[in-house]
Amino acid sequence: MNILVIGDSCDDVFVYGVIERMSPEAPVPVLQPTNKTSNGGMSKNVYNNLKALDVQTTLITNKEKIIKTRYVDEGYNQMVLRVDTNDKCRQIDEALRMNICNNQYQNKTYDAIVISDYCKGFLTKSYIESICKSNTNVFLDTKK
């Protein structure tokens, strides 16, 4: 099986730590970091999950690096803050979109296409519609 994944992606960063006091400067908790993890998020998460199942997978995603950093109190396992960096991305190239619509991206034919749209600007409604109309096995997950 050969699957094409298209969509917005990000790096999901989790900073875990301990909160023992409030800041004297403002009514906010002070987090002492103890651990940090990073994973692919959004369409990268779909791609990584398919790869883990030994599925041949290709990812088309944004070049701009979107980072979602979550700060978590490990004592209560509660997120206390999320910081988003570079939250938007450029649209997919028209020539690339036409190759996808013709199901011939990189001279490959795909058994299925997964569209993972998180509304960050990489895919437009018209791009999604044309990909869906031009291919039979399309799975769409959109936040719209």
Model-derived features: positions:
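Ribokinase/PfkB-type carbohydrate-kinase core domain
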Residues: 1-26, 33-144
